[in-house]
Amino acid sequence: MRRAGCATVEAVHTDPTSLTFRSAEEADWPAMALITATGFGVWRSEETVAVWRSMMPADSAVVACDGDDVVGTALFLDLELTVPGGAVLPMAGVSMVAVAPTHRRRGALSGMFDELHRRMNAYPIAGLEASEAEIYGRFGYGAATVWERLEVHRRGARFHLAVPDPGGVRIVRPAEHRAQLEDIDERWRRRTPGGLHTPARLWDEILADREGSRNGGTPHYCLLHPDGFAFYRLHGSDEKTTVEVTKLAAATAEAEIALWRVLLGLDLKEIVGVHTHPGNVLRYLLTDPRLVRTTNVEDGLWLRMLDIPAVLQARTYSADLSVVLEISDEFLGRGGRFALQVRDGHAHCAPTTADADVHTDVSVLGSLYLGAHRASSFATAHRLRCNDSQVLAALDAAFAVDVPAELGYGF
């Protein structure tokens, strides 16, 4: 793996609750699997676990123990996150976080997170998906992407006359076109804030298409365009009338339109569903946008800045900006006062003693980073304080993005 090094830490930490926190050992993995299956209600196969373990740096898993018993688990993966403008940051992807129901509210999660974040010194940023939205803000994580669940009643769907029909889509067996799928996915993620590099072992797992990953659906079908692809499954009773798009990656607008034309042209199917970013183009393609229904909206990727200046300097910006940020960070103490200067899309950020224009915490900064949320919204909610409306408008303009943020894949 590209980043195998982590900070050296003590082997065991003990807290007042009598739980101990230490590095996970090989013998702990069966117990870790039991704890996570109990927490999430899903058993992962040994083959699937091996794939995710191949993405872990050394010493990146910790366990909480009550005596000899493992009662909690947490780890992080070595991921590559695309940020606005196309730069890529190494990201510690926190995963497999679970505590036994017998040991709730005894400090297991806090103890594991203390231990886990000590090991992230090689990373400027960390990310996770939150099973419960109220948990992770206190650790400095903020929701940075949004999933919108769309359903289309396809029988009445008609495309506007102005919408082109690019063509070029084929129905293929995905394993026979792996190289092309990998290339398209890499092009897509390089332009998409929130995109993640998919390593070879994870592609092996995707194409293995194990029954445990199907959520009751059929094996994957694949639509392939020179600049995009869509994976989908069929769900329902014997007739399988619901199409569930599990991944749509388009490197061009033409490819996205071409794929939607085929998906909405699947005869004998009633509903096409997809999880996508807010503002998806689909409604604008159809003569009757009411056929596209939003059935759910929820957070996707949560981000936590570990090196604030480095992370803010990594992305590009949509407008010039000169602002002093006062960032609080109660969990790790990595906040402070920072001068952020943006000229021609590029930023310089450094600690300063100047008076602050904006006061907020590191979780809000994480939510703003990929452009999915506006500073003015947090100001309205009193989670960001700024007494100058022009500065607030400048923040909104600078952090805005042309390409909507979208999490590359779940981890």
Stretches found by the model and what they are:
Residues 27, 34-47, 186-198, 267:
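Helix-loop element at the rim of GNAT/NAT acetyltransferase active sites that forms part
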Residues 63, 69-78, 93, 98, ...:
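Conserved beta-strand in the GNAT
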Residues 121-150, 279-295:
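Conserved active-site alpha-helix within GNAT-family acetyltransferase domains
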Residues 113, 117-130, 267-278:
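Conserved GNAT acetyl-CoA-binding A-motif
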Residues 1-17, 84, 162-411:
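Intrinsically disordered, low-complexity, positively biased terminal segments
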Residues 39-83, 194-221, 311:
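Active-site rim helix/loop that mediates acceptor-substrate recognition in acyltransferases
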Residues 89-101, 240-251:
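Conserved acetyl-CoA binding element of GNAT-fold acetyltransferases
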Residues 94-118, 253-264:
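Conserved acetyl-CoA-binding loop-helix of GNAT-fold acetyltransferases
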